[in-house]
């Protein structure tokens, strides 16, 4: 019996950790626009998932920052920071990003602006281009 004690203790620990009824509570944070079919963000336990953001100005989703990819990346990152702030988080808390570009040729300039927002670490990232994002939306 003594030789199985470590296994029993390990299994008990694993099963205890799997009881996530309180730890992984899911909270859906509604989007500012009640016409969209998704949440602005969803929190599961301590993890916050943010829906895709664009370079809209002043909560007006019909007004996209002008001037090309760099200003759009910066406005998009500001919009992300604003959502994080509402949930007592910062860019330092981000662990994964997905960047979608209208034009793959914007990868370089987008990356140059993107890294300015991550001073303490580099989150995992997936980036792809050639997507139809909408009128005037580059990222």
Question: Model-found features: residue ranges?
Answer:
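N-terminal presequence-like segments and the immediate start of the first folded domain
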Residues: 4-95, 101-139
């Amino acid at each position: 019996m003594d030789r199985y004690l470590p296994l029993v203790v390990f299994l008990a620990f694993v099963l205890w950790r799997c009881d996530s009824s309180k730890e992984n509570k899911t909270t859906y944070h509604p989007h500012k626009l009640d016409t969209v079919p998704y949440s602005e963000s969803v929190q599961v336990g301590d993890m916050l998932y943010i829906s895709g953001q664009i370079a809209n100005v002043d909560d007006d989703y019909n007004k996209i920052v002008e001037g090309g990819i760099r200003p759009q990346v910066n406005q998009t990152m500001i919009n992300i920071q604003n959502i994080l702030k509402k949930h007592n988080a910062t860019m330092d808390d981000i662990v994964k990003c997905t960047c979608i570009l209208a034009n793959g040729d914007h990868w370089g300039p987008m990356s140059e602006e993107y890294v300015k927002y991550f001073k303490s670490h580099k989150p995992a990232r997936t980036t792809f281009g050639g997507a139809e994002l909408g009128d005037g939306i580059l990222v």
